Amino acid sequence: MAMSEQPQPVAGAAASTTKARTSFGILGAISLSHLLNDMIQSLILAIYPLLQSEFSLTFMQIGMITLTFQLASSLLQPVVGYWTDKYPMPWSLPIGMCFTLSGLVLLALALVGTGSSVFHPESSRVARMASGGRHGLAQSIFQVGGNFGSSLGPLLAAVIIAPYGKGNVAWFVLAALLAIVVLAQISRWYSAQHRMNKGKPKATIINPLPRNKVVLAVSILLILIFSKYFYMASISSYYTFYLMQKFGLSIQNAQLHLFAFLFAVAAGTVIGGPVGDKIGRKYVIWGSILGVAPFTLILPYASLHWTGVLTVIIGFILASAFSAILVYAQELLPGRIGMVSGLFFGFAFGMGGLGAAVLGLIADHTSIELVYKICAFLPLLGMLTIFLPDNRHKD
C-alpha cells in the first residue's frame, strides 16, 4: 500500500538558511561511549556458560538474568526520554554511566539496566544534534559503536574471563570510568549547544501525517522491532549453547563464533543509516527485516561451517534496520526525539529480555535446536512494512 505522504523534519518559522555542519568529533565520542557501554552489557551475556556450569542454572534462569537488566532499561527509557524532551539534562550522561559502573562493581544487573536507560535516549539526542541534517549517518555512527562494543564482549570473555575466571570482570570497571570521562566532555558540548539555542525562537512543530496514520506506522515499527530483537535474543543469549550442544564446540570456540556474528551486526549498522538517507528509510527496513528470512529458515538445518556463514549474513542484514527504523520514527514524531528514542531503545531492550526468558523456557522443556526452528519465522513479519507510509525523504 504505497502512500504519497511522507515523514518530514520539523519545520520552523525561523529556519536557518545556513546548513549545519556535521560534528564528527562529537559523533565519534558518543559512538565510543556507546561502544564501552554495550561492551560491558555484552560481557554479562558472554559469561553465561560459566555461570551455568558454576551454579547449575537452567536456560529459563539464564533468560531471567537477561530479563532483569533489560526490563529495568526497557521501562525507564521512554520515561527518561519524555522528561528530557521537556527538561534537557546534559549531565545525565555521565551520571547514567555511574549507575552502570556501580552495577558492574556490585554485580547488580538492574543498576546496569538503569544506567543504560539514561544513556540511550540522551545519546541518541546528541547524535541527532551533531548530525548536521545527516540523521541516518549520525545514527549509524552512534549505533555502530554500540554494536561493535557488543561484539567485543564474547571475544574478551574467551580471551580473559574463560581462562582466568569470572573475577576478572572487575577489570572492566576501567571501561566505565573511561566512558564517564568521555561523556563529561560531551555533556559540556551539549550544555553549550543548549545555551546557544535557549534564546532562539522555538520551531513550530508540524506533524507530517494524521494522528491515526502515525499510530499505525509506529505500531508497525514496534512489531518489526519485536521480530528483530526476539530473534537477536536467540543468538546473543543461546548461540554459544547451541554450538556447544549441536556441534560439540568448546566455550572459547563458541564465543569466537558469537563474536563473528556480533561483528557482522556492527558492520551492518554502518550501512543502514547512510543508505536510508539516500534511498528512503522504508526500503532499508523492508530489505533488512524480510530480506533475512531465507537465511534464518535455512540456519537450523545447516552444518557447522554453514551455520557460521549464515549467522554472519543474518547479523549483517538484520542490523541495518534499527538506524532506519529509529530515524523514520523520529520524523513521524518531530519534537519528541528523546521520547521516541527512549520508546524504541526501551522496547528493543524489553523484547530482548523477554525473548531470552521465553526462549529459555522453551529450550528447557524441548531443546535448544527447536528455539532456532521457531525463531526462523520471525523475520516474515517484515511483510508488514508494506503498510508503512512511503518515505521518500532524503537527507
Please place each PLM-identified region on the residue numbering:
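Helix-to-loop junctions at the C-terminal end of transmembrane segments
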Residues: L76-P88, T269-G280, A363-D364
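Helix-loop-helix hairpin linking two adjacent transmembrane segments in secondary transporters
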Residues: F142-A192
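Flexible cytoplasmic inter-helical loops of multi-pass small-molecule transporters
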Residues: Q185-P208, D395
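Conserved MFS/SLC helix-loop-helix module at the cytosolic interface between two early adjacent transmembrane helices
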Residues: L75-V105
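Residue-level signature of mid-helix packing/kink "hotspots" within the transmembrane helices
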Residues: S42, Q70-P78, S150-S151, L262-V270, ...
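Cytoplasmic helix-loop-helix junction between adjacent transmembrane helices
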Residues: L109-G145
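C-terminal transmembrane helical hairpin of 12-TM major facilitator-type secondary transporters
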Residues: G276-I325
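Extracytoplasmic gate region of multi-pass secondary transporters
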Residues: I44-L45, L216-L262, A266
